[in-house]
Amino acid sequence: MAAKILDGKAIAQKVRDEVREGVARFVAAHGRPPGLEVVLVGEDPASVTHTRSKERMSNEVGIRGRLRALPAATTEAELLACVAELDADDTVDGILVQLPLPARIRAHAVLDAIDPAKDVDGLHPVNAGLLAMGRPGGIAPCTPVGCMRLLAEAGVELAGARAVVVGRSNLVGRPMAQLLLARHATVAIAHTRTRDLKALCREADVLVVAAGKAKLIGGDWIKEGATVIDVGMNRDDAGKLVGDVDFDAVRERAAWITPVPGGVGPMTIASLLETTLRAAEARVAKR
């Protein structure tokens, strides 16, 4: 029996509707909308598309989303000055610096300069540390948060489940594992250099794949009845957008699966909007 499809577009719309209602309550209580600043250095076509989408969708739910497009020649010092300005602006609740940055700019220096309370990408060491220690008050990266919402919408019981995360990036793999641990799953982190990766994946009740390798996971890598979350975004030889999972083969064994496109992607931006609202609420609550 073919797997059920976890429709990220539909669930993302549900999240956006919830955020829109929350923003309206925030404005009524505080007289201003939550503010999100997206900072872009240069004119990389993919980054331009992503940042404009974030700006547009923020404004659609009532968040004051603004894109700061800086020249490609921007120096690290100039970018740090921009971040410092946004840190000091009380109307800004969320700051997102679009990655990747030009090679001459140290990404860690820029990310570390963002006020942790405004770090809606969840990449500041303070937020990463709080998440790793299982302590409240931090901000988790948006893609793993979106994946957790997908699992919740599918009604997947995580407590006691065997979860395998293929990928170890700071943006997806590592925080995804921490969020699953917090829900009492038994978690293994793997990657493309893991020995016997196929055997490990076959043990997973929940498999989250963020390896960045097209169709890495085949149908015979999947435990019957598993839930498969495909975070990958790749182009095949024909230029078609595909995930890290061989969708047609895997859906014959899985119980639930996310498509690419239309699965995790829409949830990432929806989760960014939700995170921005939560950051705004947390900031005003501390005053």
From Swiss-Prot:
GO CC annotations?
cytosol
How is the subunit organization of this protein annotated in UniProt? Homodimer.
Matching HAMAP family: THF_DHG_CYH
* Residues bound to NADP(+): G167, R168, S169, T192
Q: State the organism named in the record.
A: Sorangium cellulosum (strain So ce56)
Q: Which GO terms describe its molecular function?
A: methenyltetrahydrofolate cyclohydrolase activity; methylenetetrahydrofolate dehydrogenase (NADP+) activity
Spell out the protein name for this chain. Answer: Bifunctional protein FolD
- GO BP terms: L-histidine biosynthetic process; methionine biosynthetic process; purine nucleotide biosynthetic process; tetrahydrofolate interconversion
Question: What Enzyme Commission number(s) does the record list for this chain?
Answer: 1.5.1.5, 3.5.4.9
**InterPro entries, A to Z:** Aminoacid_DH-like_N_sf, NAD(P)-bd_dom_sf, THF_DH/CycHdrlase, THF_DH/CycHdrlase_cat_dom, THF_DH/CycHdrlase_CS, THF_DH/CycHdrlase_NAD-bd_dom
Role noted for this protein: Catalyzes the oxidation of 5,10-methylenetetrahydrofolate to 5,10-methenyltetrahydrofolate and then the hydrolysis of 5,10-methenyltetrahydrofolate to 10-formyltetrahydrofolate.
Catalysed reaction(s) here are:
(6R)-5,10-methylene-5,6,7,8-tetrahydrofolate + NADP(+) = (6R)-5,10-methenyltetrahydrofolate + NADPH; (6R)-5,10-methenyltetrahydrofolate + H2O = (6R)-10-formyltetrahydrofolate + H(+)
Family to which the UniProt record says this protein belongs = Belongs to the tetrahydrofolate dehydrogenase/cyclohydrolase family.
Known pathway: One-carbon metabolism; tetrahydrofolate interconversion
| Alphabetical keyword list | Amino-acid biosynthesis, Histidine biosynthesis, Hydrolase, Methionine biosynthesis, Multifunctional enzyme, NADP, One-carbon metabolism, Oxidoreductase, Purine biosynthesis
